[in-house]
């Protein structure tokens, strides 16, 4: 599902258009008509330095091959365009890697005993026997094997259209990638990509708060009382991180 968006009275409005895995605009589903962003940030995540001073990031969890595939995937979910930075510029891949060493990724935040029903509504919580970090490890290897078998190439070497087609097959559940159902992997990847793009920069993504600037989200300021009764006025201050 992807979203076409437009602004009216300084609010982001959304209209469902159709199915397309290669449009970055469907990430706007993570943003409501107001400046609220839904996040599932895990406790204990490492703090990332400012993108202006940070040295080249080295993944703490993913192998070199997994890291390259993950970057290629998130780059196609949110490619850079005139609206704002892409996933790579925003550090989404770094956010996901940092998450892999938190209680969240180990499955410590929810009930992890059978039975699991992957088709359950989101309200029923996480529904897979692998913790997120194990899911990624299995799915990324399975994806690489499936693409090699089908196209004779590594996923990272495919052109943009081919990558989008593969991601579309994951979304539709038609590309077998081993032990992890393709739809389950796509849903996990999409959710973490949204979180990394729109989360507070303290968690490693949303570099320079670029995603917040794109949607005019004010961030984590402690006090808005000076603006409560200034109806219809543009809020002029830049977004603020919790750090």
Predicted regions span which residues?
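Short alpha-helical functional segments enriched in proximate histidine and acidic residues
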Residues: 33, 76, 196
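Sec-dependent signal peptide hydrophobic core
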Residues: 30-38
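Aromatic-residue-lined binding/catalytic grooves and analogous aromatic/hydrophobic interfacial grooves
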Residues: 31, 102-107, 118, 224, ...
């Amino acid at each position: 599902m992807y979203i076409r968006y437009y602004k009216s009275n300084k609010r982001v409005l959304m209209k469902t258009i159709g199915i397309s895995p290669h449009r970055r605009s469907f990430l706007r589903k993570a943003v409501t008509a107001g400046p609220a962003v839904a996040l599932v940030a895990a406790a204990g995540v490492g703090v990332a330095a400012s993108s202006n001073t940070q040295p080249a990031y080295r993944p703490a969890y993913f192998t070199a091959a997994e890291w390259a595939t993950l970057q290629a995937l998130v780059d196609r979910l949110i490619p850079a365009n005139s609206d704002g930075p892409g996933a790579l510029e925003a550090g989404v891949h770094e956010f996901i890697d940092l998450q892999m060493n938190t209680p969240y990724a180990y499955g410590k935040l929810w009930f992890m005993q059978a039975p699991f029903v992957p088709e359950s509504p989101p309200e029923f919580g996480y529904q897979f026997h692998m913790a997120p970090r194990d899911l990624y490890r299995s799915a990324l290897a399975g994806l690489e094997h499936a693409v090699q078998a089908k196209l004779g190439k590594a996923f990272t070497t495919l052109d943009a259209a081919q990558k989008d087609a593969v991601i579309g097959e994951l979304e539709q559940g038609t590309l077998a990638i081993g032990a992890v159902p393709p739809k389950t992997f796509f849903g996990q990847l999409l959710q973490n990509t949204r979180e990394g793009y729109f989360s507070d920069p303290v968690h490693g993504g949303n570099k320079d708060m670029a995603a917040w600037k794109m949607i005019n989200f004010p961030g984590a300021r402690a006090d808005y009382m000076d603006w409560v009764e200034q109806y219809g006025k543009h809020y002029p201050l830049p977004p603020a991180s919790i750090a």
